């Protein structure tokens, strides 16, 4: 850390992705835009190789810590097992886990130096399904891309929302 002009401490922040890159025009890019927009030049990112393993994710975390990161933003549920290891290995580092649940981490409690941010994808899906059915569409489908937990939850919500609207419409 270095001192800013008002004597304020600058915290070094790093962002790591479980898959993909920071210019994917999707989830990773949105996270990087937020972190770099807030931190300016005081942040770094670490991108996995294709088909990264838990060991590869641990290596990225280790590299971020070795580069001086005090806060590491870990993007993606695949970080679960790696966060369990990292939180114990680096108790003075704070971890912000995006789209990671306690179940993904696999511990009885979320580690005290880890903050998990999750989304309620099923609610957005419900609203989309409800709206499209209320708009009079009767032949609906859902193409979610990859069968990952967040997309599956969105799909469940979509079906439930469309069904609720259909029930109301008779």
Please report, for each region that a protein language model flagged, where it lies by residue.
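A residue-level marker of the well-folded mature domains of exported/periplasmic proteins
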Residues: 2-170
